[in-house]
Amino acid sequence: MHDKKSPMANSHYLKNLKQQFRNKNLIETTIHLVKCNDHDSLAFLARTYGVPPQLRHVVWPILLKYHPMCISPNITSNTISWDPITNDFILNDPFLKSKAPTDKQDKSDDENILPYDIESIILHDLKKYFHSRSNPAGSSSNANTTNIATPTPVSSSDASTISSMEVLSPSLDYEFQIIETLKNAIVKFLLKWSKIFKYENGLAWIALGLAEWYPIYPYETMSPFNETHSFYEVEDYVVLSGRKHALLSTNNGNNGNSNSSSNNTNNNNTNITSGMHNLSINTNTSLHNSPYISHTLSYLYKEYPLPFELRSKLPTKPIFSFSALFERLALVILHCPDTILAHKQLKNDSNASSSSKANSNFNTNYFPIISGGDLSFQTQVFFKVFSSILPELYQPLTEESSLQPSSSRNSWIYWWLKCSGAKALQRQDRGRVWDLLLGWRPKPNMDTINFFLNYNDKKMDHLYHDTPQCDNEQYWMKDWIALYNNDPFWFPDLDSMALGSKKFPYDYSVFKELILRNRYGGTQSKAQKDNTVPSPGSDSNDKSELKLPFSSIDPHMQLIFIFIAILQFNEFKLLEFEEAEISEFLNNVPLLTKFDDSSYRKLYENTESSITSLPSSPTTSTMASLQSSSNSSAHISNYHMLIEVGNDAKASHCFDDLLNMAGDIWRKWLWRELEESSL
């Protein structure tokens, strides 16, 4: 007698099938875009759908190579601050306040050389990652850990997947070399940017977060980086596997498809400290004599399998060394517009205006919610939105002294906002958040670019395109653009406004126009009609109609609303927590994207399933059904903001749900602010 599945079970099963079908098509599309270097389309997929975890080590370097904030960088400074009273900069000493400066340290500052004890502090911070979990009960901390187990031979029948490979633990000496390499990447960044940014422990966790997705070569300092070296030809490349679930993933990551590591290693290796399980290491084992089946990315492909025929299409030459890629990632995460310049421009415009009201209130006009502000402004907006959207949760969180944000770098708000989720978010969630940061792109014209990068003096619009540049773009990109034909943080009429033009040079001028266009609902101005963009999903074969949607607001402002969505997503749970439990949640947010993560882990698990027969392009019927569900959630009513207990969407643990919720919060909150403003 067959068990009869409930409608709910069937619903989840169908959702799983659709998600796996979409993910397989996303992987194939991404590989094709990488091959033809269509970085515009890759950025679009990264900020909307996310980069498949199997491919981040290939896609992230491309995104960072063309990122506007890397081409024209400006980062927040912790060495100087602006004093509005004296209208001048003042020097800060953001670290080592308890240590009296020595002659050696003073001399090193003058010569733009790092203080002598900074490297030891960096090493201390990095080691926290590797030893964040104690040894299992009964294990000896003094055990010999210098032996590395012999890898289990892999048969040719496993060519389609390497999920059965054993992840080996390196020796302590090897771990120290890895830590040294990470430290050197941070030191290189500080040597270049030390006059603007002194070391903070956030840099260590950003480097570690990058190393969880991008391979590092531990002997880079002894053997200089060479772009001719392949990931798959050079031995000893390492990918960190994450500190939170390393032990669990190592032993159980294959759902029973692999033997326990204890069956293949000696007793000495079982006593390796917990940090040792955080590493995957390259060996000489290969399949079909192909470099693409190297153990270089063994942990990554063990956790997120990728068939051989797809791996063989990936480029083999790294674009950047780890230290170079870390610098670019740090430039994006620490990016800050020139707020001093923005205030001066607003003041000059106010002085030139005949309106005395504008002249006296120019400071109130500086509210860069679209173009982005500094960390102080981001923190202000975060708590302003928090108190407005979640008042019942905001009150207890702000009343508890241990939960209040402070200048301490142990504060949860430091990790959330300044470090873009480093340390506080799980590896999978942080990777998806960084996808959004690295995929951020404004419209490809200099007015809009300079609206977000107000300090910029470089011409870069020729690097970007508003149409896909891949071969047979209609074939590859049309359905993806149709699914997300709007930026998640769209706002009515915002996309039709020429940001940065003479008419809309500042955020407040944009706000005035938005109020004018939307205050009397149903009225569409001539300007709106003239700027109406054809639907990307139209049936026309005109190439110009296949337009890529671009980002509407600054990426760090987007993160604010994503974090508010995380709090709203867990509101009922947090209201029941004690103070210590809330603090643990804020500093160590549980995995949010379980559904997405599980889908990618099991993507190629059932080889006999009908969904494993991957078409060359998304089929019309399946993509149409996905488009219907995506559009309905993307354009959900601004007033439908409550979480319903037992809601399927709430239980799905999908980042798309968080992203759509964040967009809803953005629109609801901004319109409320505009209605209450005096613009």
UniProtKB/Swiss-Prot annotation:
Residues 135-153 have a biased composition (Low complexity). Residues 50-441 form the Rab-GAP TBC domain. It comes from the Eukaryota. It is found in: Cytoplasm. Keywords: Cytoplasm. Residues 524-539 have a biased composition (Polar residues). GO terms for cellular component: cytoplasm. Residues 135-159, 250-270, 524-544 are annotated as: Disordered. SUPFAM superfamilies: Ypt/Rab-GAP domain of gyp1p. Required for replication of brome mosaic virus (BMV), a positive-strand RNA virus. Belongs to the OCA5 family. This is Oxidant-induced cell-cycle arrest protein 5.
